């Protein structure tokens, strides 16, 4: 099946082709006709399946037929994901499409001014959207005809329910609501029954499933050699685009600096960065200005980067669900990819829980460890230097 078979406007198909998107993914083949049909939709799909374009294309197609301001409102759980969705809509700005991004960390008054210019599409996080609903008169949510909740399962993890209770009543009763989620839960079922009317349910993934194109491994390594194993993996992956997941912001900062000292082109992405610096890090990684991104779970959703070759879980994820969202940064939209999880003697029970959730065993990654001793001295020295650098930074920042 081609995009033309889905009744998508030819100009939009041409734009997709220019971006290297030539054939619809499974979720796009199923969701696009349902959205064009006008009814409410629940889509349960794997991360990396191309779901963003699955709602962007039919919504822009409708806008080409009838130009309306405040036609679509998209709510996403993180600033990063909101930015990615806005970027996806902006692929089609040659059509005259106006998109407004509402996220925290950006100037509220500037956003209010953008809303006064009557955008066609508004994308943002629940907290900032709710704030504009209450304070910005030019935000005409009663005009919204397409309401999208993306990665809806995340709203309950981050307690956005109160914000949704502000946003949803402000919308018109007669609208199309689209709900996308990686997993189905009791909370999602309850939410969908309260805001959707006779929805069409589309499942392109069962609960806790990774994509077939993803090769998944674990690397068992003693705790004392964990840093060495990371360096060895990165040296084996020269020229590849790599995301390294860690559990804490301080680890992301230290490891990123340490790896840079060892000659790797690395940057960090974590929750202590300003919104401007987060966006710059993501943009630079996307543009291949560096190839190793060290990040916390902040980046495990919302990073829609097509060229990620390898995900390394330096720290084992807390749950099977977190594992899926991390490794879902590679092998996206039909491309292949690899995920390797470092497992120390202290992580065995946790990785077994993840395997139980996934209902499969990860394959062991075989690696020669004879160089670990030499590597260890280099990485430990680099880590010590990185820690000293951060210590000096903190001192400078504390000075009046």
Swiss-Prot record:
Keyword Ribosomal protein listed: no
CDD domains (UniProt xref): DEADc (cd00268), SF2_C_DEAD (cd18787)
Residue ranges of the motif DEAD box: 150-153
GO molecular function: ATP binding; ATP hydrolysis activity; RNA binding; RNA helicase activity
Subcellular location: Nucleus
InterPro entries linked: DEAD/DEAH_box_helicase_dom, DEAD_box_RNA_helicase, Helicase_ATP-bd, Helicase_C-like, P-loop_NTPase, RNA-helicase_DEAD-box_CS, RNA_helicase_DEAD_Q_motif
A GO CC term attached to the entry: cytosol
List of residues binding ATP: 45-52
Keyword Protease in annotation: no
Biological process according to GO: rRNA processing
Sorted UniProt keywords: ATP-binding, Helicase, Hydrolase, Nucleotide-binding, Nucleus, Ribosome biogenesis, RNA-binding, rRNA processing
Major location (coarse): nucleus
Residue intervals of the Helicase C-terminal domain: 229-373
E.C. no: 3.6.4.13
Catalysed reactions, as listed in the record: ATP + H2O = ADP + phosphate + H(+)
Motif segment (Q motif): 1-29
Domain (Helicase ATP-binding) ranges: 32-202
Residues spanning the signal sequence: none
Quaternary structure and partners: Interacts with the SSU processome.
Family: Belongs to the DEAD box helicase family. DDX47/RRP3 subfamily.
Its biological purpose: ATP-dependent rRNA helicase required for pre-ribosomal RNA processing. Involved in the maturation of the 35S-pre-rRNA and to its cleavage to mature 18S rRNA.
UniProt remark on domains: The Q motif is unique to and characteristic of the DEAD box family of RNA helicases and controls ATP binding and hydrolysis.
Protein name: ATP-dependent rRNA helicase RRP3
Organism: Encephalitozoon cuniculi (strain GB-M1) (Microsporidian parasite)
UniProt lineage: Eukaryota, Fungi, Fungi incertae sedis, Microsporidia, Unikaryonidae
Gene that encodes the chain: RRP3
């Amino acid at each position: 099946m081609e995009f033309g078979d889905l009744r998508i406007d030819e100009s939009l198909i041409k734009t997709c082709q220019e971006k290297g998107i030539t054939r619809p993914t499974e979720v796009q083949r199923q969701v696009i006709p349902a959205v064009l049909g006008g009814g409410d939709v629940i889509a349960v799909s794997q991360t990396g399946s191309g779901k963003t374009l699955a709602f962007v294309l039919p919504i822009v197609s409708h806008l080409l037929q009838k130009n309306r301001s405040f036609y679509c409102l998209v709510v996403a759980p993180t600033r990063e994901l909101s930015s990615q969705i806005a970027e996806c809509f902006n692929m089609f700005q040659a059509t005259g499409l106006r998109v407004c991004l509402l996220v925290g960390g950006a100037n509220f008054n500037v956003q209010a001014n953008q809303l006064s210019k009557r955008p066609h599409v508004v994308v943002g996080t629940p907290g900032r959207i709710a704030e504009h609903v209450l304070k910005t008169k030019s935000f005409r949510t009663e005009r919204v005809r397409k309401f999208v909740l993306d990665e809806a399962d995340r709203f309950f993890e981050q307690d956005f329910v109160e914000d949704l209770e502000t946003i949803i009543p402000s919308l018109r009763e007669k609208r199309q609501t689209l709900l996308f989620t990686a997993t189905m839960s009791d909370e999602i079922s309850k939410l969908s029954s309260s805001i959707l009317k006779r929805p069409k349910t589309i499942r392109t993934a069962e609960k806790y499933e990774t994509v077939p194109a993803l090769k998944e491994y674990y690397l068992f390594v003693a705790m004392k050699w964990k840093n060495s194993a990371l360096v060895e993996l990165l040296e084996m992956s020269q020229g590849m685009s790599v995301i390294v997941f860690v559990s804490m912001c301080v680890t992301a900062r230290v490891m990123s600096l340490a790896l840079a000292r060892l000659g790797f082109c690395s940057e960090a992405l974590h929750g202590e960065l300003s919104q401007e610096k987060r966006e710059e890090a993501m943009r630079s990684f996307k543009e291949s200005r560096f190839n190793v991104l060290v990040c916390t779970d902040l980046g495990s959703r919302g990073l829609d980067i097509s060229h990620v070759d390898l995900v390394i879980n330096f720290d084992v994820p807390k749950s099977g669900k977190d594992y899926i969202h991390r490794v879902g940064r590679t092998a996206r939209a039909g491309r292949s990819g690899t995920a390797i999880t470092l497992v120390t003697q202290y992580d065995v029970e946790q990785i077994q829980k993840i395997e139980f959730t996934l209902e499969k065993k990860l394959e062991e990654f075989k690696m020669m460890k004879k160089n670990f001793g030499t590597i260890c001295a280099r990485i430990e020295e680099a880590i010590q230097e990185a820690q000293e650098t951060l210590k000096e930074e903190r001192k400078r920042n504390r000075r009046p």
